[in-house]
């Protein structure tokens, strides 16, 4: 087969351009990324070789070897792992076979424009191979997949295309040769390579050798599984570098959990909570990313049974001697031992989070900002640990821009307050100013501002926090009559409740119901409004307006007008004027429709009829009053 030239996927071309021209802050990470990929390739073959020994071809001693050619200006990183065939070469090195590629390119570009030129996103997005182009103006890969006879060569200068051709005599695995740029020739110095490997790859369980011109290859790393060492023999720096390896991140992990469980079921866990959000935190598969080993033999990095999905931000390894080496996907799904490991890991992680929250609330809030939206999924999904997870939750409120615990808010409840109140929406600042919370704020009642989509679901699973009911301010009745305003005075309501005034409001309500028809289930006087003329709320027990909106955005629902109630403020001057008009037989139809659209807009919706809304608004502006 002759050489074939192919074009990179569009997003890869953008990525390469950014890598080549912008990301120069810490170029030596390319070696860490390529060694990490080589280690993964060896792990995969070791696992496949358990059930298909012929794939090992009589060579089960896995290794990664570095070699340099000073005259040619090349650095080669070779492994005897799983290797790739033609299809895999094109799939893995010509495309980014993951969702969100455009988002990645944009995020990487934004990072590159920052003063630091942060390159941590490269590994996080599973494209560490492309970091080679930070130091090379040409990259060649010679590879042969285990169990196949044909070898292949992949070559590219990173400028939009790559070539693939057959090659004879290729060894199993992959050899990546970098033709180094003139300003990257320092990577031809063997002492520099030793330093980089010792710093970034000492924990790699596969031996990393340096092949000099004379003598036997020299071992550069310790090549022992870090998690098997006693904790007191591991430095913070070694933990951090191992985290960089398993998480493909550059930041310091926020938390490290390393322990050995003994007894009927034995396993070792080395887990990390990242210092920043992984890019794939909100992908649809919601899979945990912890590696499973059996007796230090890699089994899978795609084991959904190790952790619940709401802890999918955790990275690390779990190694057990009580699982069979030939464990299959089906066995993993049904293995009671794995369920026990999952329970143990989950409990330890939640306990550690609770301790960090007690010991250092400020540091815990950093974690919460990154992963709170995911952790709250567990409140809805994990009945057994629901109360523990509720205790870990932090929320902004109408009284606090800094997220606080529910225990704190309950401790600040007003005398006579019967429930813990919340409102859901897209933006905390907007929620704090929404009409539905006016009456609560006026009475000094603190309201939780819930802005994550998952909030709509977990609140349905938590009717009470301890002995305190949890209630939506935009649903059902307001229940504020027993609470005094902050200044200790109730509104001057004698006149408002006089028979004549009540009759006027009744006339207005009847007229507005007639004008709005089926757009609402009811129109009623509000106890929650103090400044705004109207607002929309959901009927008691009905789906919230915000959840209706989320479902419509996901094409899973429509406006449920039969569940909506329009509340009017009897103390507002505009409402009083309309009541006078309705009581004397005047029409309030146009005003009712205009106020309904105003309430819709405040809920983040469009008017029912934008053209009619604009016409009514123009007429009102022209008259100067209704």
Curated annotation (Swiss-Prot):
Molecular-function annotations in GO: ATP binding; ATP hydrolysis activity; ATP-dependent protein folding chaperone; unfolded protein binding
Keyword Cytoplasm: yes
Chain spans, region B: 330-549
Entry keyword Chaperone: yes
Subcellular location: Cytoplasm
Alphabetic keyword roster: ATP-binding, Chaperone, Cytoplasm, Nucleotide-binding, Stress response
Coiled-coil parts of chain: none
Region annotated C, chain positions: 550-626
Location (main, coarse): cytoplasm
Region span, A: 1-329
InterPro entries on file: HATPase_C_sf (IPR036890), HSP90_C (IPR037196), Hsp90_fam (IPR001404), Hsp90_N (IPR020575), Ribosomal_Su5_D2-typ_SF (IPR020568)
Any one Gene Ontology cellular component term annotated for this protein: cytoplasm
Similarity comment: Belongs to the heat shock protein 90 family.
UniProt function note: Molecular chaperone. Has ATPase activity.
The protein's assembly and partners: Homodimer.
NCBIfam families associated with the record: PRK05218.1
Name by which UniProt lists this protein: Chaperone protein HtpG
